[in-house]
């Protein structure tokens, strides 16, 4: 074999060597990348399971002594659990048998007087200082609007314990009839509800009344349509 042919064989072997080794290197890099990805994914999954308590040792839910929750949610839950449930409340309904007047009853179905709230002389009495929701609804009914057009009023008044003066806290005026009623128009039945409600800072001993100027138009066909009440907040 000549020297030139030997040199040519060595050069051919050197050119063939990278072609043979190249695919093995590519497969090795691909395997390392896959292994790294699986390792990172497994570590992430393990961290999430430990973080959310899916795996790991079970701990008692009771907090150790001297440990306090300071998060807003914990404070809200703690204050709610300590909030007193004995708040005054009153809900009374109108007496359907009272002719020509609005008289409130507390001993009927769906009425309530609790935690000091009282009904005295047709008035609700506040048992303690605090913030209260005061509300009332009247339902009126009639037949036709001619010749006289009724003007309905609904008023909730307060008699303060500090000064015996009647003050209107809530009031409304409504007319169930149109401004102009043509002569000879058919007398059709009408219904007109008036609801009043508001939140007030009240004192112990304050008294409330709910009144109307035309009690003869009150609708007592169904129970619970005419009511009056207060709720401590």
From Swiss-Prot:
Quaternary structure and interacting proteins, as annotated: Homotrimer. Interacts with SPPL2B.
Cytoplasmic side: 1-34
Originating organism: Dasypus novemcinctus (Nine-banded armadillo)
Protein name (database record): Tumor necrosis factor
Lineage: Eukaryota, Metazoa, Chordata, Craniata, Vertebrata
Signal peptide residues on this chain, from the entry's feature table: none
InterPro entries membership: TNF, TNF_alpha, TNF_CS, TNF_dom, Tumour_necrosis_fac-like_dom
Modified residues (Phosphoserine): 2
THD domain residues: 88-233
Extracellular compartment residues: 56-233
Membrane topology, record value: Single-pass type II membrane protein
Chain's role: Cytokine that binds to TNFRSF1A/TNFR1 and TNFRSF1B/TNFBR. It is mainly secreted by macrophages and can induce cell death of certain tumor cell lines. It is potent pyrogen causing fever by direct action or by stimulation of interleukin-1 secretion and is implicated in the induction of cachexia, Under certain conditions it can stimulate cell proliferation and induce cell differentiation. Induces insulin resistance in adipocytes via inhibition of insulin-induced IRS1 tyrosine phosphorylation and insulin-induced glucose uptake.
Pfam families (alphabetical): TNF (PF00229)
SUPFAM superfamilies noted in UniProt: TNF-like
Gene that encodes the chain: TNF
Sugar-modified residues: 80
GO molecular function: cytokine activity; tumor necrosis factor receptor binding
């Amino acid at each position: 074999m000549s020297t030139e042919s030997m040199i040519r064989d060595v050069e051919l072997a050197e050119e063939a060597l990278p072609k043979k080794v190249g695919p093995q290197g590519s497969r090795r890099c691909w395997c390392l990348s896959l292994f790294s990805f699986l390792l990172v994914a497994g570590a992430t999954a393990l961290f999430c399971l430990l973080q959310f308590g899916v795996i790991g040792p079970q701990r008692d839910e009771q907090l150790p002594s001297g440990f306090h929750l300071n998060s807003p949610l914990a404070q809200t839950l703690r204050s709610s659990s300590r909030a007193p449930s004995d708040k005054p409340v009153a809900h009374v309904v109108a007496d359907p048998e009272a002719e020509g007047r609005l008289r409130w009853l507390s001993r009927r179905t769906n009425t309530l007087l609790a935690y000091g709230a009282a009904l005295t002389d047709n008035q609700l009495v506040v048992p303690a200082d605090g913030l209260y929701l005061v509300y009332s609804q009247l339902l009126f009914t009639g037949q036709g609007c001619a010749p006289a057009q009724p003007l309905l009023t609904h008023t909730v008044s307060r008699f303060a314990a500090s000064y015996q003066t009647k003050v209107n806290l809530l009031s409304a005026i409504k007319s169930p009839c149109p401004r102009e009623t043509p002569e000879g128009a058919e007398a059709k039945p009408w219904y007109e509800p008036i609801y009043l409600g508001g939140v007030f800072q009240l004192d112990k001993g304050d008294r409330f009344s709910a009144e109307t100027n035309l009690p003869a138009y009150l609708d007592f066909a169904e129970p619970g349509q005419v009511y009056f009440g207060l709720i401590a907040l």
